[in-house]
Amino acid sequence: MLLHIPALFTADEVSRIRAALEQAEWADGKATAGYQSAKAKHNLQLPQDHPLAREIGEAMLQRLWNHPLFMSAALPLKVFPPLFNCYTGGGSFDFHIDNAVRDIQGGRERVRTDLSSTLFFSDPQDYDGGELVIQDTYGLHQVKLPAGDLVLYPGTSLHKVNPVTRGARYASFFWTQSLVREDSQRTLLFEMDQSIQQLTRDVPEHPSLIRLTGTYHNLLRRWSEL
């Protein structure tokens, strides 16, 4: 499932965040890549312990944990602290699949990368290229969203970032360990949850809503891992 979540941050918030990112000191993005990915990765990245990365990352996590669409789709158990990258001057990241497990800095905890996310901090008209290209069973999807918008997709997906030939593309990326590791099961639960919410608005007193909600929770109980 590939899901677009709009306006996680407002235009004013994005403007302030981008201004701060533009003034930050960036490092070579290869530092956080695996062996294979490092050969394909050509970008800049904020160090994980950078104060700005922590500040923006904490604000992102607060928004995400209170966002009904993200919660419904991701069913998050753990979220890896957001990382931040910059693509400019031909920077790109060739096709790769993210590492299955990521160590949170310091090695105190691990996160299984069931879901990947990118939050855009640059508007599409501010740079050329830089599309996030995601491959799934239905083909290739090119994603280039407005600043403040997020895309959520399975961590098992082959994906790349096209070269940025003009301007700069600022973004955050992170991974989520879901209560439900299998994408097809998460998709079914998401569609069921969205249908229940719509029916609750349309026919709030319908007696079948109780049974349908019970079925959702019984499936979640069967498939979830804690």
From Swiss-Prot:
<feature type="domain" description="Fe2OG dioxygenase">
    <location>
        <begin position="78"/>
        <end position="178"/>
    </location>
</feature>
<keyword id="KW-0223">Dioxygenase</keyword>
<keyword id="KW-0560">Oxidoreductase</keyword>
<dbReference type="GO" id="GO:0006879">
    <property type="term" value="P:intracellular iron ion homeostasis"/>
</dbReference>
<dbReference type="InterPro" id="IPR006620">
    <property type="entry name" value="Pro_4_hyd_alph"/>
</dbReference>
<feature type="binding site">
    <location>
        <position position="169"/>
    </location>
    <ligand>
        <name>2-oxoglutarate</name>
    </ligand>
</feature>
<keyword id="KW-0479">Metal-binding</keyword>
<dbReference type="Pfam" id="PF13640">
    <property type="entry name" value="2OG-FeII_Oxy_3"/>
</dbReference>
<dbReference type="InterPro" id="IPR005123">
    <property type="entry name" value="Oxoglu/Fe-dep_dioxygenase_dom"/>
</dbReference>
<dbReference type="InterPro" id="IPR041097">
    <property type="entry name" value="PKHD_C"/>
</dbReference>
<feature type="binding site">
    <location>
        <position position="159"/>
    </location>
    <ligand>
        <name>Fe cation</name>
    </ligand>
</feature>
<dbReference type="InterPro" id="IPR023550">
    <property type="entry name" value="PKHD_hydroxylase"/>
</dbReference>
<dbReference type="GO" id="GO:0006974">
    <property type="term" value="P:DNA damage response"/>
</dbReference>
<feature type="binding site">
    <location>
        <position position="98"/>
    </location>
    <ligand>
        <name>Fe cation</name>
    </ligand>
</feature>
<keyword id="KW-0408">Iron</keyword>
<dbReference type="Pfam" id="PF18331">
    <property type="entry name" value="PKHD_C"/>
</dbReference>
<dbReference type="GO" id="GO:0005506">
    <property type="term" value="F:iron ion binding"/>
</dbReference>
<protein>
    <recommendedName>
        <fullName>PKHD-type hydroxylase PSPA7_5129</fullName>
        <ecNumber>1.14.11.-</ecNumber>
    </recommendedName>
</protein>
<dbReference type="GO" id="GO:0031418">
    <property type="term" value="F:L-ascorbic acid binding"/>
</dbReference>
<keyword id="KW-0847">Vitamin C</keyword>
<dbReference type="InterPro" id="IPR044862">
    <property type="entry name" value="Pro_4_hyd_alph_FE2OG_OXY"/>
</dbReference>
<feature type="binding site">
    <location>
        <position position="96"/>
    </location>
    <ligand>
        <name>Fe cation</name>
    </ligand>
</feature>
<dbReference type="GO" id="GO:0016706">
    <property type="term" value="F:2-oxoglutarate-dependent dioxygenase activity"/>
</dbReference>
